[in-house]
Amino acid sequence: KIKEGQDKLYDVAADNYSTAKNSPSLEVFKQKDIEVLLLSDRIDEWLMSHLMEHEGKQLQDVTKGSLDLGDLEGEEEKQEQEKIEEDFKELVERIKDVVGEKVEEVRITHRLTDSPACLVVNEDEMGMQMRRILESAGQEVPATKRIFELNPKHPLVEKLKAEQDSERFSDLTLVLFDQSM
């Protein structure tokens, strides 16, 4: 069922239904009661990469790129997100220094409501399920760097922001990064 003002159909592809259903990328959709297609067949991600729209609605993988809910978010919500991003700029830079070349980018996200962090791929990159399929078939898969997204409202991220000890900050950052994989 599509909500009023919804201009995209959202989907998530995973190895199985349970993994798709429990993806951290779905948290904001659950909170806003937006339905997402849960895809668990091996061919689904490939198929969705070739289907650009359905009945005039653009299809969007919720685990790729930046998340734009369009008219489903009010102007006030968008302004609050921009303010939060500004407040966390210093933390983002500190985390970039720690994770360095492991990621393409570190950024604050509103995609997460319960989880402290997640990794997403760029909009035009191959998804993780497709990578696993190709690797299991013995195909060479191009190396890509993912985007490390942080939930600014999570207590762990807030603790990280306040951490002054650089060694402890690095350790906590790397644990958070590893848990996101």
Model-derived regions: residue spans:
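Long, intrinsically disordered, charge-dense linkers/tails
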Residues: 1-181
